[in-house]
Amino acid sequence: MPVGVVLAFLAYASFSVADALIKTTGPALSVFEIAFFTTTFSIIPAMLTKRGERWRDMYKLEHPWLVHLRCLTAISGTACVMYAFTHIQFAEVYAIGFTTPLFVTLLSVLLLREHVALHRWVLLFISFLGVVLVIRPGMRALETGHFVMMAGAVLGAITTTILRHVAPKERRVSLVGLQVLYSAIVNAVLMLPDFVVPTPAQLGVLLGIGLLGGMGGLLLIQASRQTPANLIAPVQYSQLIWAILFGALFFNEYPDWIAIVGMLVVVGAGLLNVLTERPRIRWKPRIFFFRIGQ
């Protein structure tokens, strides 16, 4: 197995553990407080590594309006995803999150004028049907978390589409640094009305979430440098396995057979979509891409 694929598995496992910790923290702290601390802590691993760019160049932008808009959509997406993790089943969050490629494709056609082959549209539609099997609207009462997560998927698609447009022209330090700065300021303000001083144990969990997210991002970057993206991208679907496992072990969540079939449909269509895509160089963030804009 290529080293990059192993690193990708470790990266997505780190993300999944961090997501499980978010779910445990949610009932006690607001999503904005969780986002503030975890995003702040997530930059620690990056600060300990060698940087190729200077932080003082962070504000030198070629597309300032788009970069700032991306920061706002990423922050909004973060709040949606964290809310969903604390209100609906673990695996359902990931299943809905995997609809993001569908929205990215739609936006790429509408805004970036990209051509999308017919077979990719078919696979994306099949993937969406898989999500319908998971959440089954009309057959059961959907919770607010389902709608919020769908909004998060749309916001994630907007964030990713903007990133695909500006990434070749902007500094990485600008894209990452401004995202962290925006997140710190906006979440610091929004968390004030419901702010709760974290206990030492909660602070330790928040630190763990941030470090795991930051380390996962670095592992994914290293994986992309060593192995082609078309081999790394399918690994993201391992998160559904972690979600089912963690949901059963720690949250007493057991998807029924229809939901499991839906997840298999999502994974199968997603893998075929990735494997039939023409290789190209681009930023490929994780499924939880929009939380800290990695």
Task: Describe the role of every protein-language-model region.
Residues L10-V17, L21, H68-Y83, A151-I162, ...:
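Hydrophobic alpha-helical transmembrane segments of multi-pass membrane transport proteins
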Residues Y94-T99, V166, E170-L181, G217-A248:
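Helix-helix packing/entry segments at the starts of transmembrane helices
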Residues M1-L10, I43-L69, E170, L181, ...:
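Membrane-interface interhelical linkers
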Residues V81-Y83, T100-V122, D194, I241-I260:
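C-terminal transmembrane-helix exit sites in multi-pass transporters
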Residues S16, A20-K23, P27, V31-F32, ...:
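Transmembrane alpha-helical segments that form core, pore/gating elements
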Residues H119-I135, G156, I258-E277:
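Hydrophobic transmembrane alpha-helices of multi-pass small-molecule transport proteins
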Residues I241-Q294:
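C-terminal-most transmembrane helix of multi-pass membrane proteins
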